[in-house]
């Protein structure tokens, strides 16, 4: 777990409207090999479930997290504050549905097939070999897991910004 200092978080509504910078009092980011990627923030502002927080880490990597859990609390003096847990934005694909897709060939071809209709696109996909798989009545996120089991490799998200 990494404590985050001097990082600017930009808030976006679930519809992509820029809500400005988030002023926070504490922030931690946890990313692990088991797929955990959580951002925990304490702030005075009211956040809404589904809002997106975009930020740049010390290595120059852009991250996007979705506000998932919100707690409105009070400190010892009765002053209200907000504690939120945010998850990696790839988790939005739990809400995207695959009716019936049967890609075959490279992992890049299969990935493009299951990401069709989402805001995500295939970036660098260098997994060698070919395979085929049926993705039937599952979420895109489940499809990504199935793809990794069938074609191998690891999933990494890259967020590109325009400013």
What are these regions, as identified by a protein language model?
Residues 80-81, 85-163:
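Charged- and aromatic-enriched interaction segments used to assemble
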Residues 1-101, 145-155:
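Assembly/oligomerization scaffold segments
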């Amino acid at each position: 777990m990494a404590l985050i200092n001097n990082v600017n978080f930009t808030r976006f509504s679930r519809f992509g409207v820029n809500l400005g910078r988030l002023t926070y009092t504490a922030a931690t980011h946890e990313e692990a090999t088991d797929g955990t990627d959580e951002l925990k923030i304490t702030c005075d502002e009211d956040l809404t479930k589904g809002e997106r927080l975009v930020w740049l880490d010390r290595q120059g990597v852009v991250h996007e997290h979705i506000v998932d859990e919100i707690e409105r609390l009070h400190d010892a003096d009765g002053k209200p504050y907000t504690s939120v847990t945010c998850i990696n934005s790839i988790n939005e694909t739990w809400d995207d549905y695959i009716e019936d897709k049967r890609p075959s060939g490279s992992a890049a071809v299969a990935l493009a097939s299951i990401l069709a209709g989402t805001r995500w696109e295939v970036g660098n996909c260098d997994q060698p070999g070919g395979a085929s798989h049926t993705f039937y009545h599952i979420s895109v996120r489940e499809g990504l897991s199935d793809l990794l089991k069938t074609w191998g490799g690891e999933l990494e998200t890259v967020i590109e910004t325009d400013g």
